[in-house]
Amino acid sequence: MQYDEHKLVEYFADAPAGVGFSDLDLNNIPHHISCIMDGNGRWATSRGLARTEGHKAGILSLREIITACVRLGVDVLSAYAFSTENWNRPQHEVNVLMHLFAKTFIDELPLLKRENVRVVFLGDISALPMKTRDVFERGLAECADHTGMTLALAVNYGARAEITRAVRQIALDAAAGKIDPAAIDDDMVASHLYTAGLPDPELVIRTSGELRLSNYLLWQVAYSEFYVTDTYWPDFDRWGLVDAILAYQGRDRRFGGLSKTEEA
């Protein structure tokens, strides 16, 4: 996606000491950046606040990262908002999250419209409370004709469930004679995932220092570069994003082949 140079320079002006924004190669920005937004609860607990306050603070960080990615010309930003396992959290926390999802989508619609952001959901949103689901569906309709960056929000998402769902759909089509089992390949499986039509993430960012995938995009991250920061999600900002992209740009992406040095 093309970036607006004036808006880019303005948004990333006055970089803090130690942040090398001028070193960023704007011709090598990942097309798809994915964020595992972790640490909201611990951020709140460390400040003597209720865990739900961390989720509220995390929304502000997501807003900043959305804007930063638009400014950088990122094609797709995906974010892990609520997993299929998160239903096991205390009911009060789940209720607050569902309310926050609905309220945030309404509150952020002006931003999404102003920045021409298209929204898609990864996961089974039919299982969400009716009020939250209705807000999501209305928001999707209002953003449907947007042609800028795609924001893919993983809500009630689990990668194993996603892959199982895809396999089941393919099996049903094969049993009905709609497809030849011999024709089943990577592309066919990918076309049955929630991310169908989206490029795989080149860069996956996980906050809070945890070194695990947490059942997230297991198929799609086969060749992704990972960046882990100890920063909790509510403290992750545009400058943290710049650091992550700089780290990505310093990697030698081999896709199972030889490095550039080895090829030489």
Q: Which residues are covered by each model-predicted region?
A:
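Flexible, compositionally biased loop and terminal segments
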Residues: 1-264
